[in-house]
Every structure is written in structure tokens, then in C-alpha cells.
Amino acid sequence: VENSTYLSEYGATFPTRIYSYQDSGGDYSVTVVDYTESRRIHSERDRTEADYELYWEVDVRASIAFAAWNLRRRGGEITYDAYHYIDRVEGHQLQITNEDQSRTYAAIYLHDSHLYIAEATVPSGSLPPGFFQQSLEFIDRDGGRIRYRNYSDAIKVRDAQVR
């Protein structure tokens, strides 16, 4: 586990925690960017005339797209690039064949002002890291599984019966 920082699309720096594991089967990580103080962090940074008061919110809402863009620009052949969700927490998945023929499987989700970037890079010829990708779920402070009954454009209602 490593504490770090993450530079957002709009130039703000956010606290980040990176959980990682490496072995001969690949490199695995989950990066969690904490956007809970976005309004304060944006208000305290140096501004230009081009800055807009609500960029703190736009920075959070656009964080999935920005993280996906950062993964795409690393290079390699993108073989999968699509919207995804876990328990109706919206996100995005990418699969990339890297220059060395290793494969990167990435999933990005935004929940409760936290951006989750899960990445697994496995050597050429390895099986896809399906368990790693499919084991991610969101839990509340009491350890209960979170599943929503509707999407973000509607009022979110928590489905209390899923545990």
C-alpha cells in the first residue's frame, strides 16, 4: 500500500492510495483517488482567468474519462474500450495489448467521490485476469454490499436487500 497523489484533468492534486501486488503472473493494482475535498482543493489552488468556479465538480464527474484517456495514451493496441458498471456504479473498461505483447486489463469506476482505477498487466500468452476484474465490488462503512436500483441521471436509491 502506497500513499501518493493524482494530478487531475484540471490541474488539481488529490490524495491517492495505491494497492498493488506483483509476481511472475503479472502486476496488479487498484488506485483510489479521493475527490471528497475537491471543492476545497480547487478553491485553494492558483487560478487563471480561464478557470471556472464549478471546475471542482466537473473534475470529479469527468474523472473516468480522464483516467481512460491516460491509459490510452500509454500506447499499445486498444482491443476493448467500453462503458461498464458494477452494481450500477458507472465506469469504463479497457484492454490493451502493450508494445511488449503483455496485456493490460483496466477498469475505472467513480463512486462516492472516489475514483477507482483497477489495472492488471499480464505477460504475453497468459490467461486474462478475470477473477481480479470481477472481484471488485463496493461496500458501505458497515461492510454491506452496495447495489443501486437506478443510474446517476435519476435519484439514486440504495437497494437495501442486497447483502
What role is predicted for each listed range?
Residues 1, 53, 57, 61-72, ...:
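Surface-exposed amphipathic alpha-helical segments
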Residues 1-39, 44-109:
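Signature of long, low-cysteine stretches enriched in small and polar/charged residues
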